[in-house]
Amino acid sequence: MIPVLNVNWQSPEADYSLSERDTDLLALIETEDLATFTFDGLKRRTGLHSETLSRILSRLEEEGIIKKEPCGYRVTTKITELKLQTPRKETPSTPLMQTYLPSDLKTQQLILNLEGKWFGMLRWLGISENNQGVTLKWITEDGAIQIAANIQGTALNIEAKFLTSNNLNLALKASYQLMSLIGKLCISTQATRPAVAQNAGYFGGSLMSA
């Protein structure tokens, strides 16, 4: 089993009947700042058995911390009532690509088109929204690498978290699969500017430009 997170737990003021495993999963959801997520994505991310994860999510749903929806789960504001301390060990993100989306592209439509998509070696995990924009998250089929695409204005940043594998080549291949999909969506949603990027930076020892 892939360990979720090494966290400290303090009993919240609200009366929640949660186990240590429940709070570990909540710590992961909070650390990833997930607003929505899928069962399959979380299963791959944590390595938990399907029945174990199902029981945990059922308890969290009973407590009103998450809400089941047709496309997965949505995190409610009740998660803010839990006093989860910052994890002592957190997987750092590695930047892979920086690029720009066309300024006349409707980014909200692009996000809607990307949300929930499975493609190539990537499986959908979830989405987060904060003052740093919208971040869409995928995980490789084997749960080894997490890929995130952050969209803030016209800026697009793609990063990786190496969970159980340090295979940079695999992460780069996954990020190019993501960029290929984004390119196709950009072309299909606007006829005036078929080019996806104005400039592209590659963090692997070389610099490329479009």
Predicted regions and their residues:
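Charged, low-complexity intrinsically disordered regulatory/assembly segments
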Residues: 120-210
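Short acidic, hydrophobic short linear motifs in intrinsically disordered regions
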Residues: 34-45
